[in-house]
Amino acid sequence: MGFILFIITLRLYFLSVISYEDYSFQATQNIMRTEILTPARGQILDRNNKPLAANDLGYSISLNPYLGKKANIPILEAELEDIVRMFPYLNLEELKNEYMKNYSSYNHSYITIVPFISYEDMNRAYTALTQSDNIRISNASKRYYPNNSLASHVIGYIGAATKEDIENNITSKYTGLIGKTGLENYYNDFLQGELGYIKTKVNVLNRPVELLDEMKANKRYDMVLGIDIDLQKELDKEFESKAGSAIVMDVNSGEILAAGSYPEYNLNDFIGGISEAKWNELVNNLDNPFINKIINGIYPPGSVIKMGVGLSFLEFADINEYTVIDTPPYYEFGGRKFRDWTPKGHTNADLIKALRQSVDVYFYKLSHKIGIENMASTLKTMGFGEVTGVDLPNESKGILPTPSWKLGNRGEPWFIGDTIISSIGQGLFLSTPIQIARYTALLATSTLPTPHFVKKLGDKTSSFPPKDVLNDFQKSKLQAIRLGMYQACNSVDGTAYSAVLGSPVKLACKTGTAQVVGIPQDIKDRVREKDMEYLHRSHSWITAFLPFKNPKYAVTIIVEHGGSASKATGPILVSIVKKLHALGYIN
């Protein structure tokens, strides 16, 4: 028994005294270091694989994590002086501050002080810098936008990750970047890829002595859009000196071939942080370049809403498309005169003529008859008052006005006059260009698509099946609606006839002029749009589908303060259709 106790005592002595020194030495000599690997961000490509958002390849510079100790500060400063000498555009104090900001006695990973140096700049300094054990040169990438402002509101940009971003997205802690707007934001999780790591055992000099584990950073491939750069450039050309929005969308699938919000801004200005001067220039621009008007521009829809309202009349007003209604120059109710857009009026009209010539009084009368609830029910089915589901962040749902909406949001009762002016897309009614484009596709196909920009995520093709939202009666009456739109473009007395004469294919369309300032209905002789101050002029709409007999695309355009709708938007529509034809999308 005594011998056994002696053996146990001897073993404890060995472990606690002799082995302690050996293990202690190893502990001070070997530390596990985990280096996080960040992937290159996925590219955003157009439908023909032309880059919309790409990556410049280069290098980053990192320093030994132990140079922040007081005794090592002279070494840190010497290394920084060498770096600045080779790259004179870098600032020594800024580099030192960046290092010390990230320095911690608990950190054993190299500290990045320069996130990106181009290949060209690094080539002449690479050999000299890599002679130092304190400096690490690693592969790096930097986002850039090869087309500058093209489709800026769609593509979006990346920027420095905030504390809140990092709390919600651990990858952004290591990349330092996150998608801020547009598709860069909406698909950020896909585009940023997945972090990797290298776990190594290092000695006190921070030199690796053993590889413990490794996982490569994973770039999740690139994202391909439905956008065609060449078609997008056509939109840009037409809106060079205009404000507003334009959308070209496949009516069957909802795939967007081109979409612009104007004015645009140069996405590359945001790489590394936008200058104060440039920021102020954009913020103070009265045409609001920071608003993505495709999804957040909310405008009175004006007469482009009349197709949906007309469908509601056919369902609830006990009429058909050929029922003729007297349409004098105005409709009088409650002591107010609700005037037609033309002082002479239109004598009489059925639904098809009311669409062809945009007969306001036809809509005034029948909206009074069926009431706002019936109209709103039809229009809600067609997607108004709700988001379309387009793959962009923070979409507005607009306003589909009803008595309950007005009471709840404005604390005011509903009046018959509200119903009457809502029937021509005025008053409280507000919609977005993407809602109008989607609604136009519904009129063309009888189904409601989900607008979308993405075509492929990596090797996975995206699918957004359209929704079957109309009842059988509504579907049966769409042909009459389409005929009214066809005649608006192709009959000599149609509101858009002269404006779209140059189109290479037959269109179905509807124009709309949406007032931005109130004009009393009692005023018979109104100021001409061209004589108004710019900001008082009406917004100009046109929406179309084409070709008429076999619809493939919807084109929706709004020109802010454009005045006469057909004159402001018709030529733009024709130019877009010609480009679609030239690119082979239509015969």
Question: Model-predicted segments: where are they?
Answer:
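Short solvent-exposed loop/turn micro-motifs enriched in small/polar/acidic residues
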Residues: E35-L37, F239-S241, H536-S538
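Gram-negative outer-membrane assembly/targeting C-terminal domains
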Residues: H581-N587
